[in-house]
Regions:
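Short N-terminal binding/cap micro-motifs at the start of the first secondary-structure element
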Residues: 16-22, 50, 319-320
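N-terminal beta-loop-helix "entrance" segment that forms/cooperates
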Residues: 30-33, 37-61
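Short hydrophobic alpha-helical runs that function as membrane-insertion/retention elements
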Residues: 40, 63-65, 105-106, 188-190, ...
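Bateman/CBS regulatory modules and CBS-like beta-alpha motifs in cytosolic regions of diverse proteins
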Residues: 66-96, 108, 114, 141-156, ...
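A glycine-centered beta-loop-beta connector
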Residues: 76, 97, 105-123, 276, ...
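A short, polar/charged loop-to-alpha-helix boundary motif
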Residues: 120-137, 301-310
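Long, charge-dense
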Residues: 132-133, 221-259
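Conserved small/polar residues in nucleotide/adenosyl-binding loops
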Residues: 324
């Protein structure tokens, strides 16, 4: 998108008088009419009463204040990508990173407040922690996340329910073995074996995930409803379900919440460059004047910044330009 830095700023000296401001306005207008440049008049200080009178007399809009022409983050072609909610699954976050070719995502609230960031490293770490069978309960994973990740459908229960207890169990063993492993509140991954499904329900599991797209019998559905056990049907096999189930956890459980390296739209690019040289992150969130999230900036964006072009008018002394250049 076009940025202010791509315009040519025409500006007079500090503590401007009438000739300084009028020179900037006139020369900016001349360059706009006689060249391909896009020029904008600015002033390097407050206008005096004489200047205000002259501009009002001729119906000329006063130029905007500009006491510093050094580039800010708002002048950089940063990525205006939307934030994602903390309820987003690890799998979905990874897919967004893959599609957008970015390794850091901002996590925002409904009113666009920055809540944290999730990186591809965070997702990789979570995926390697496969032995934590209680992760869905710890992270308060929604059934909706599980359905989305496994491509499943809800057979018994509500999509908005949340995993609050239990461990993940793979129920491919015999019903006799299931009786000794499944506990109340567990999440059990099963096939179409009727006896195993019934055993898991009788052991008061909280959720059954029936794999291979198998249909769930009416009797099992009725008993599950009576026992308060939710049932899902998923097209994947038990191996894939076991691999994907931990990726259903929400990113809010893994994201970085504190000490987030972020910038504002008015942060000088020089300061940003110094910070980026000291840390290994590639993308950094940007906040607007209201403290709301508005985009991400990377080293590449900063390097690609076009230098700001300036035309100085009515500058007779070297000290005249110190306040703006």
């Amino acid at each position: 998108m076009p940025k202010t830095a791509h315009k040519v700023v025409v500006i007079g000296h500090r503590n401007p008088d009438t000739d300084s401001i009028c020179s900037a306005i006139a020369y900016a207008e001349l360059k706009n009419k006689t060249s391909d440049l896009v020029c904008e008049a600015r002033r390097a200080g407050k206008m005096n009463q004489e200047t205000e009178f002259v501009l009002k007399k001729f119906g000329v809009k006063p130029p905007r204040m500009c006491t510093d022409v050094n580039p800010k983050i708002r002048d950089v072609d940063y990525r205006e990508m939307p934030g994602i909610p903390g309820t987003t699954s690890l799998r979905k976050a990874w897919e967004i990173m893959r599609d957008k070719q970015i390794d850091t995502l901002p996590v925002t609230s409904p009113d666009n407040e920055l809540e944290g960031v999730i990186t591809v490293k965070d997702i990789a770490t979570a995926n390697m922690d496969v032995f934590d069978t209680g992760i869905l309960a710890k992270s308060q994973t929604t059934y909706r996340n599980i359905l989305e990740t496994l491509g499943g459908t809800m057979v018994v229960g509500r999509e908005d329910d949340v995993c609050t207890t239990g461990h993940i169990r793979i129920g491919t063993a015999t019903p006799e073995m299931l009786e000794n492993t499944v506990e109340k509140g567990d999440i059990v991954i099963l096939t179409n074996r009727y006896e195993s499904q019934l055993c898991a329900i009788e052991k008061e599991a909280s959720l059954l995930i029936i794999c291979n797209g198998s249909k769930v019998g009416h009797t099992i559905q009725r008993i599950a409803e009576e026992m308060g056990v939710a049932i899902m049907s998923a097209p994947v096999d038990t191996y894939a379900a076991g691999k994907l189930i931990s990726q259903c956890a929400p990113i809010s459980y893994y994201m970085t919440r504190s000490d987030i390296m972020k910038f504002t739209l008015v942060t000088p690019v020089a300061d940003v460059t110094r910070v980026m040289a000291k840390v290994r992150h590639r993308y950094f969130p940007i906040l607007d004047e209201d403290g709301k999230y508005c985009g991400m900036v990377s080293r590449r964006n900063v390097i690609a910044l076009r230098k700001r072009r300036i035309i100085l008018v009515d500058h007779n002394e070297a000290t005249d330009r110190k306040s703006v250049v």
